[in-house]
Amino acid sequence: MSVFTPAEVEYLKSQRLGRLATVSAAGDPHVVPCRFRYNEELDVLEVGGGNMGKSKKLRDAAGNGRVAYVIDDSPEPRKPRGIEVRGRAEVVLTGGDEIMKGWDPEFIRIVPSHVAAWGIDTDPFKPKGRSV
């Protein structure tokens, strides 16, 4: 059983870009837009892109092990929707280049521990979060 609702899964499958938040060993926050895919088999998000192997986001994820990722849009005025996923970051050193064209071999797999959504199964202005 997925940690995401069926409507959330459909939303994740329809999107390709989100924002990854990490924290450095010194405690400095870092947020960067990057591509992702939802891996339905593992029920995780996989985040990657070009130059991932040398990126701050990969170093932060490897060092801290905790990340957050937000996917959102607003297809109509005043109708925002999105999902925030917080969880454990697994740095995977091979296979990213087989997931998506333009990705480096290295990528970050996010294993969800908390999901918050708005405008998908809920009112767009009343996010609902849950530990998973």
PLM features per residue range, with description:
Residues 1-19:
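Short, basic/aromatic recognition patches
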Residues 16-50:
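Short beta-strand segments
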Residues 36, 87-89, 110-112:
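A structural signal for short, well-ordered beta-strand segments
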Residues 42-44, 66, 88, 114:
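Structural motif
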Residues 45-47, 69, 117:
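Short hydrophobic/aromatic-rich beta-strand segments that constitute the beta-sheet cores
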Residues 51-106:
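Short, structured beta-strand-loop surface elements
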Residues 79-80, 94-132:
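C-terminal edge-of-domain segments
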